[in-house]
Every structure is written in structure tokens, then in C-alpha cells.
């Protein structure tokens, strides 16, 4: 199943090293393909370096795409991470 959702970055420093690591670790156990799109650039969200290269700042809208058998669960986990400011 393929799901798409827009999420806003709420933490002060945007998608820097700590949030990128949180996201990559969160996605380690998922079988779904996960990508983020920001400013017409789409990246593999399981890659810390790719997330960092987006250079997404606070209040940026990220389009999250999840495609796979565990898409609902994976999307919910990503949403919670964004809502909780990646634990910051």
C-alpha cells in the first residue's frame, strides 16, 4: 500500500544530524520504502546523509511517501517523530 502525507518540521534546528539519526533508526525495521520530498528533491529517508542533504529548516513542509506492506504503521511512527520534534 502506498501512503503520502505532508508533515511540518517543528523543531528549532530543522533536520540536522540528531533528527536524521532518529528517523533512520526508526525506519531500520520497516520493510516499506520511505522517501521524503522537499523543494522538488526526493530522497531515501532511510539514509542519514540523504536526509541531511535536504537542508530542511524549521516550519518546512516535507512530503512523506511510504510504500509497502507495513505502510500504515510506518507512516504513524514517522508522524509521531515529527510531532514530538524528534525527541528534542
Residues covered by each model-derived region:
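Compact, glycine-rich, soluble single-domain proteins
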Residues: 8-49, 54-57
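Intrinsic-disorder/low-complexity, polar/charged segments enriched in Ser/Thr/Lys/Arg/Asp/Glu/Gln
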Residues: 2-6, 61
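Long, contiguous binding/interaction regions
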Residues: 3, 29, 73-77
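Secondary-structure boundary/capping motif
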Residues: 1-2, 42
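A broad "ordered helical/assembly scaffold" signature
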Residues: 2-3, 19, 84-86
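C-terminal structural segments of small proteins and small subunits
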Residues: 53-88
Amino acid at each position: 500500500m502506498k501512503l503520502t502525507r505532508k508533515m511540518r518540521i517543528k523543531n528549532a534546528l530543522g533536520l540536522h544530524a540528531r533528527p536524521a539519526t532518529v528517523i533512520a533508526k526508526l525506519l531500520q525495521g520497516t520493510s516499506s520504502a520511505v522517501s521524503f520530498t522537499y523543494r522538488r528533491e526526493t530522497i531515501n529517508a532511510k539514509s542519514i546523509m540523504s536526509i541531511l542533504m535536504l537542508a530542511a529548516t524549521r516550519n518546512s513542509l516535507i512530503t512523506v511517501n511510504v510504500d509497502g506492506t507495513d505502510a500504515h504503521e510506518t507512516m504513524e511512527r514517522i508522524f509521531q517523530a515529527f510531532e514530538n520534534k524528534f525527541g528534542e
